[in-house]
């Protein structure tokens, strides 16, 4: 909200608001997580001012509620995101995504020789956090990658 208390992105009556997405990541989330695979209205705010992040993206999806598992998968790209479930214009539940143990069917293995790139199988990674760094290990080629290596491949 701005200092004159006007909303920059219209409020929704019912649905999900994904807030505190790092700037320039909103479109990537929409694509990777197939958030546009609905006929419901989706509102996107890009490069909005944020006291916490400086700039942020925001996604509002009407009449759709993300599960806790779906929210946690967002933490790979947007570790500071919050997922708010809205009903009658009020936040009825706030999810703070945490890194999942596994992520399937979303990311692409950076190993060009991995079978997940050429065979009809869903990619699958185990997620490990060590010393503040996130590493993803491919189920198929068993190679481990830093989070940024997997994210840049997308």
UniProtKB/Swiss-Prot annotation:
<dbReference type="GO" id="GO:0046872">
    <property type="term" value="F:metal ion binding"/>
</dbReference>
<keyword id="KW-0479">Metal-binding</keyword>
<dbReference type="GO" id="GO:0006207">
    <property type="term" value="P:'de novo' pyrimidine nucleobase biosynthetic process"/>
</dbReference>
<dbReference type="GO" id="GO:0006221">
    <property type="term" value="P:pyrimidine nucleotide biosynthetic process"/>
</dbReference>
<dbReference type="GO" id="GO:0009347">
    <property type="term" value="C:aspartate carbamoyltransferase complex"/>
</dbReference>
<dbReference type="Pfam" id="PF01948">
    <property type="entry name" value="PyrI"/>
</dbReference>
<keyword id="KW-0665">Pyrimidine biosynthesis</keyword>
<comment type="subunit">
    <text>Contains catalytic and regulatory chains.</text>
</comment>
<comment type="function">
    <text>Involved in allosteric regulation of aspartate carbamoyltransferase.</text>
</comment>
<protein>
    <recommendedName>
        <fullName>Aspartate carbamoyltransferase regulatory chain</fullName>
    </recommendedName>
</protein>
<dbReference type="InterPro" id="IPR036792">
    <property type="entry name" value="Asp_carbatrfase_reg_C_sf"/>
</dbReference>
<feature type="binding site">
    <location>
        <position position="114"/>
    </location>
    <ligand>
        <name>Zn(2+)</name>
    </ligand>
</feature>
<feature type="binding site">
    <location>
        <position position="138"/>
    </location>
    <ligand>
        <name>Zn(2+)</name>
    </ligand>
</feature>
<dbReference type="InterPro" id="IPR020542">
    <property type="entry name" value="Asp_carbamoyltrfase_reg_C"/>
</dbReference>
<feature type="binding site">
    <location>
        <position position="109"/>
    </location>
    <ligand>
        <name>Zn(2+)</name>
    </ligand>
</feature>
<dbReference type="InterPro" id="IPR036793">
    <property type="entry name" value="Asp_carbatrfase_reg_N_sf"/>
</dbReference>
<dbReference type="Pfam" id="PF02748">
    <property type="entry name" value="PyrI_C"/>
</dbReference>
<dbReference type="InterPro" id="IPR020545">
    <property type="entry name" value="Asp_carbamoyltransf_reg_N"/>
</dbReference>
<comment type="similarity">
    <text>Belongs to the PyrI family.</text>
</comment>
<dbReference type="InterPro" id="IPR002801">
    <property type="entry name" value="Asp_carbamoylTrfase_reg"/>
</dbReference>
<keyword id="KW-0862">Zinc</keyword>
<feature type="binding site">
    <location>
        <position position="141"/>
    </location>
    <ligand>
        <name>Zn(2+)</name>
    </ligand>
</feature>
């Amino acid at each position: 909200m701005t200092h004159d208390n006007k909303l920059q992105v219209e409020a929704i009556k019912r649905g999900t608001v994904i807030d505190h997405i790092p700037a320039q990541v909103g479109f990537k989330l929409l694509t990777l997580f197939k958030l546009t695979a609905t006929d419901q209205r989706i509102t996107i705010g890009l490069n909005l001012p944020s006291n916490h992040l400086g700039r942020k993206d925001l996604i509002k999806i009407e009449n759709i509620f993300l599960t806790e598992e779906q929210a946690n998968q967002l933490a790979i790209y947007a570790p500071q995101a919050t997922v708010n479930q809205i009903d009658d214009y009020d936040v009825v539940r706030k999810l703070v995504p945490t890194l999942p143990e596994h992520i399937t069917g979303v990311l692409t293995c950076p190993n060009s020789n991995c079978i997940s790139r050429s065979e009809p199988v869903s990619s699958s990674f185990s997620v490990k956090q060590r010393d503040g760094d996130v590493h993803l290990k491919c189920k198929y080629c068993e190679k481990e990658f830093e989070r940024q290596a997997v994210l840049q491949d997308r």
